[in-house]
Amino acid sequence: MFPEVRDLPSGIVDGQNYFAPIDWGDTTLFYMPDRVTWMNADNESFSLMEDPRVKGKVGILDSAADSLFLMMHHLGIDIREKDQLTKAAIDQGIAKFREMRDNGQIRAFFGDTSSMIEALGNEEIDVALGWNEIAWNAGAKMMQPANGTMTWACGLAIVKGADLDKAYAMINGATSAETSAYLLSEWGYGHSNKAGFSTLTADELAERGVAANPATHLSNGMFSVMPSDEVTDYMEAQWAEMVAGG
């Protein structure tokens, strides 16, 4: 297992590791290079989602913890610092999305990436805010701008009172070499188990937007933290209201 994801500070409490990391990747923008012809690796910017040339062609993942955080990052808020993730910062990000929604920039908020991939394929949208598998499954370019993508890791924790045999069986399966190879190959996500990486070539990893070592990947991204419970509840409520049209 890669120590860089095994030993993430957010998974360690009082010196004890409570987090079994599974997959890791990015929240970023994706664009269709044959339709967004002016964008390339040298000028990639999250400002693309506000570009009038893609008005009505932007798809946003309906997830405050992803889309709103990426917007705050775009607006210059340091999403790695908990003290910057305030209600005022949430309001700033929500206001920008509401502005984009009201001026017709956003085509739709999508509840899952499969729908976004389909929308990119049928030319309903040209730009999508989402996760790695969009690039792999839609033929879209995964944006990696100079100011960094938003990087994340997902994993499992055991709740108090759980059946430990069943919990460990699930964790062992989720962190296995077979799962690593599958997530890399079929979803384009990085994995905590090194074994899966040997099943893909360097070019295949690059095609999926995944570095061969998470240390490199995580250092090139913005690994966000969650705000306080109070701000998180506020964020989710404001996001739901905005997506619903309020």
Segment roles from a protein language model:
Residues 121-122, 126-141:
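A ligand-binding cleft/hinge motif common to bilobed small-molecule-binding domains
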